[in-house]
Amino acid sequence: MSSKSASKLKREAKKAERLAAKGESVKPSKKNGTKNGKDKEVDGVTKDLSELSTSDPIFERSASGVLTSQPMSRDIKIDSYTLSFHGRLLIENATIELNHGQRYGLLGDNGSGKSTFLESVAARDVEYPEHIDSYLLNAEAEPSDVNAVDYIIQSAKDKVQKLEAEIEELSTADDVDDVLLESKYEELDDMDPSTFEAKAAMILHGLGFTQEMMAKPTKDMSGGWRMRVALSRALFIKPSLLLLDEPTNHLDLEAVVWLENYLAKYDKILVVTSHSQDFLNNVCTNIIDLTSKKQLVYYGGNFDIYMRTKEENETNQMKAYLKQQEEIAHIKKFIASAGTYANLVRQAKSKQKIIDKMEAAGLVEKPEPPRQFSFEFDEVRKLPPPIIAFNDVAFSYDGNLDHALYRDLSFGIDMDSRVAIVGKNGTGKSTLLNLITGLLIPIEGNVSRYSGLKMAKYSQHSADQLPYDKSPLEYIMDTYKPKFPERELQQWRSVLGKFGLSGLHQTSEIRTLSDGLKSRVVFAALALEQPHILLLDEPTNHLDITSIDALAKAINVWTGGVVLVSHDFRLIGQVSKELWEVKDKKVVKLDCSIEEYKKSMAKEVQSRDTTAKVKHLI
């Protein structure tokens, strides 16, 4: 008999004893959806879950609003919500409406306040019922001696102990609250501690962990793998409100496919930011658009449906706007021509009242045109191919050929190359980029590079190396003015403007910019390097969708070569002409599209999970 059925029988037996003592009969118990929506008291453990994932804000953030959802509802509705950060207004008089069972994709430009909004909701800046426990994923697991599985399940073990203590206390009380006791039993049943380790292993396995990696202390893991541990805990806890800020960052393509499939079944409230249209299409049931007017606008459906609906709405709004403006112009023309004739003056006053009523009711606003900006890399002089050639290259970090990460690599790269490198995490994609740049040296074979070749590399950690106490304008002028001494201030501003940085974003300290805006500063600096080859290691991690499209267009018209490592299927499809897979110490050129590659990967993920079940991993 399972622990779940045993606890239920125990619950029913105790309930029967109490009711029999009162001379009453036992009524069939009913289970109505998620238990959290029925709690009558503040659940201290669910509060603890929020505290696991949030901390006091480092920077100044203020928010206000009015909770209007019902106290015991599993939904959240907050009216008149306003959010500021560093004194800058991000959201004004908007409505937060998050319904149980829905999965929301949160969209907005870089710097619009998406991450700050998630932090505000997780921190309960505007209070909502404590029975709705929340978890915000925005940081990696801390380094410690605890292994991945124990790190994940410890908080759940603590919650079970507290629930058992509460049940014991409620069961022995003089005046037993049967409804509350029932909800506590149901909550304990749903957790089922006997499955904790298996469930944790299943999630870790899905995100690419082997059995050996699961047993490693988190202090022995890289930041990327610790981020996966943190993501695994968020999925394991399964809070009533799960807030994920760019969860696909640090994942390889295979893990992204697994996460898409997992989150598509999430049956509580999910709010996720993502730069991947594929991900938003496969996961989300709704879209929230944080607009330039500082409003939260809600759309039903996934990203593609959102785009179609938004375009239709804007088309209809433009028609209504033009029609109304034409009507107003016609009325004003009549009023202007009325002169002093008494009967015409009366008509003119009547017509003016029509305009006054329109204005009082609110005129149709002209739709804002889509924000347009483009990344731009300067043209460079063509070099004869191959400008980079690998000849029988082998590489090992310890110099031992028996431990080689690569063997027998032979290929060429030229200025027409548009290569996307794919493969699992840990197979050496970033290492390959470092071999191309010369940062790493082969232990066998050689890499030849054309004399005068200039390369520029973007890595997912490039933004962390920016001088945070300087503004973007100060940074690029201090760094590149010796290279371009003739440039005036406006020309430097223009460089930043080419990458969507304008106004205060150019002159504010870099530390105050969003991660996406910091990434744009890095791209502006890369453009000033005027390279022949761009090496891009996860360039989309902090860019919004508009920025990614701008990057893709810039790459496609640029005259230099590009080698790309990315987990963004759409960007790969937009820019790559070749797919190279890193596998079994080799680099293999694939004869398929990225869409076909994703389909084959999805089949592999499904097969792998089936195998894991057979091996009792789950």
UniProtKB/Swiss-Prot annotation:
What keywords would UniProt list here? Answer: ATP-binding, Cytoplasm, Nucleotide-binding, Phosphoprotein, Repeat
As stated in the Swiss-Prot or TrEMBL entry, residues carrying the post-translational modification Phosphothreonine are: 54
Superkingdom, natural source: Eukaryota
Q: Where is it located?
A: Cytoplasm
Ranges for domain ABC transporter come to 76-325, 388-609
Q: Please give one Gene Ontology molecular function term for this protein.
A: ATP binding
Q: In which broad location class does this protein mainly occur, judging by the first location in its UniProt entry?
A: cytoplasm
- Any Gene Ontology biological process: ribosome biogenesis
Name listed for the protein in its UniProt record:
Uncharacterized ABC transporter ATP-binding protein C16H5.08c
PROSITE patterns registered for this protein in UniProt: ABC_TRANSPORTER_1, ABC_TRANSPORTER_2
Q: Which GO terms describe its cellular component?
A: cytosol
Identify the stretch(es) annotated as Disordered: 1-45
